[in-house]
UniProtKB/Swiss-Prot annotation:
EC number: 7.1.1.-
GO cellular component: plasma membrane-derived thylakoid membrane
HAMAP family recorded: NDH1_NuoI
GO biological process, one term: photosynthesis, light reaction
Function in brief: NDH-1 shuttles electrons from an unknown electron donor, via FMN and iron-sulfur (Fe-S) centers, to quinones in the respiratory and/or the photosynthetic chain. The immediate electron acceptor for the enzyme in this species is believed to be plastoquinone. Couples the redox reaction to proton translocation, and thus conserves the redox energy in a proton gradient.
Subcellular location: Cellular thylakoid membrane
Name recorded for this polypeptide: NAD(P)H-quinone oxidoreductase subunit I
Organism: Trichormus variabilis (strain ATCC 29413 / PCC 7937) (Anabaena variabilis)
Pfam families, per the entry: Fer4_7 (PF12838)
UniProt biased composition (Basic and acidic residues): 183-194
Family: Belongs to the complex I 23 kDa subunit family.
Catalytic activity entry: a plastoquinone + NADH + (n+1) H(+)(in) = a plastoquinol + NAD(+) + n H(+)(out); a plastoquinone + NADPH + (n+1) H(+)(in) = a plastoquinol + NADP(+) + n H(+)(out)
Gene: ndhI
Gene3D superfamilies per the UniProt record, alphabetical: 3.30.70.3270
Amino acid sequence: MLKFLKQVGDYAKEAVQAGRYIGQGLSVTFDHMRRRPVTVQYPYEKLIPGERFRGRIHYEFDKCIACEVCVRVCPINLPVVDWEFDKATKKKKLNHYSIDFGVCIFCGNCVEYCPTNCLSMTEEYELATYDRHELNYDSVALGRLPYKVTDDPMVTPLRELVYLPKGVLDPHDLPANAPRAGARPEDLVEKTEA
């Protein structure tokens, strides 16, 4: 009889412990359900890249002196610089410049060491294509004006954690009516219907 009571007592303790574990898990779940979503509705809302973001390289053909410093400092010798020596002016004449962004590691060395500042990093990060050969940008494609998220009228630019009031570090301790980073899908539907 004593052995049976001990088994019942052990079973009760284990049941209470299991209930505690389930309660702890559910408390975490309910805590996350109470929080606001921080999802950004990507095609319609985009986060503004940071100040030192290294995106697509912008190239200014007129400033380039074909010194090939960018090729020498590139860890993978990526930029292709085609030039010829002009005997009349005794200077290099640039014929062609290209970078394959399918191979580029966006380290920024070419931009940093360029003596004429003809290369610069942009905010563009949407370089996806269906064919990898389309990522090989020549001097014309590299020279097109850089795209800025803030200039696109079809996109709502968002700064990361821009909705946090001053002094608040935790994005989950906000009042319910505070502006948020990403709009809920139902809010987007209401905007289009209105």
